[in-house]
Amino acid sequence: VRTNSAASSRDGGGERLVRQSAVVQRVWLPGVAVAVAVAAGAAIASTEQLSERALPGALAHAAIGYYTRPTHDLVAGLARRVEAGELTLAFDETTGYLRPILDALAVPVASQMLVMSKTGVQGLHTDPSNPRAIYFNDEVTVGYIRGAPLLEFAVQDPEQGVVFYALDQKPQARPLFDRRRGCLTCHQAYTTLHVPGMLARSVFMTPDGLALGQFGSYDPDDRTPFERRWGGWYVTGTHGSMRHMGNAMFKSGDDRESAISERTLNRTSLDGLFDGRGYPSAHSDIVALMVFQHQARITNLVTRVGWEARVAAQEGRADVTAGPLRDAVHELVDALLFTGEAPLTSPVRGTSGFAEMFAASGPSDSRGRSLRQLDLERRLQRYPCSYTIYSAAFRALPDAVRAAIYARMREILSGRDRSAQYERLSDADRRSIIEILSETLLDFPRM
């Protein structure tokens, strides 16, 4: 997929670090596909407002420079280390560079999620017998398909949004990470809020891995009803009486429920569904899937708010207290506080150990409380404020924007705003969130 027609990123020493492919190709995050119209009821009104407001010309705007400014993401940093000879990536005949890259980027194997559907440029290599594996941490997502020619990366740059790379799965003295320009054909769309972002579709999938178009599809996040999640994905974990679309395969003429059964629900193992040799984990953990979908939504919102603010400042209209920028800030705050989250009606338990690993990664306050602690009985997080508030991208938001975010959070968490959409935030929730943030987020104002 590499091309000789390429531009190179350069550091201060002028050495080539990451080649930027000039050819437009449909390379996207594994398991993540083109934004499509969401079936009735799946869209959320507030996000529709942002989605309807495009940002024409933003990629090339002087305040953004998506393809021209230096990148400061984890994959670019890894590329620099490999190019400088500071890090050697060992090649394995089965998994290629996957394991050393996961180690170098601190991406846990326990985060593995498996996609059965034929989405992405390497769709010919993907079906229920050879799923696409996705691994992630707070900043980077790595995609691997057994026997496919590429590893794929989607990584959040603190200012640029999600940046896409690919790596050839063949032995090389110094593997070269290609920055992929064509990914934005699908990864800058209505569903990503018109910024380079993340997508995670839920489809009605046929036994050969194709999406059955007659039923439409969903672009789920933490607000999406459980029963509309994970179509086209393998799912391991228990979830009581709740139903989901994972592990199910539909045929033309089926109704929406016909393929969902005891065989597809509450699976603690994928034994008998496909040959798992060549994958680092035997799981496609339900808790990892829930966390990933929440994180994808926040990733897009943080990028959108940052881009709106930087473009507005460049054009001399950076008032965060009124107009579109204020609305974008309010949407981000609502997402951080899990406003509109679909409630859980049964306990959820994963199988890979991801939940325990995630919850233990902090930071914690003096009472041992953390925004990474999971509830999984009524909702995703024990304390309903997103851990993504600690991310490098959030910290990179303009100071005035972060101040506006904190001011809006104060209105809600102090109880001054008791609008109906925040009624699921109990007084104890609000107090705990304030206390945790006051100790663990340095610039969070004391209340």
Q: Which residues make up each language-model segment?
A:
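Bacterial N-terminal signal peptides that target proteins for export
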Residues: 17-32
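Bacterial N-terminal signal peptides
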Residues: 30-41
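Sequence context surrounding c-type heme c attachment/ligation sites in exported
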Residues: 137, 143-339, 380-447
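Short, structured secondary-structure elements
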Residues: 75, 110-115, 120-131, 145-155, ...
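Acidic, glycine-enriched catalytic cores built around paired aspartates
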Residues: 339, 350-377, 393-394
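Conserved small-residue
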Residues: 48-122, 131-138, 225-227, 232, ...
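Serine residues within intrinsically disordered or low-complexity segments
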Residues: 5-9, 21
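Boundary at the C-terminal end of the N-terminal hydrophobic targeting segment
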Residues: 42-47
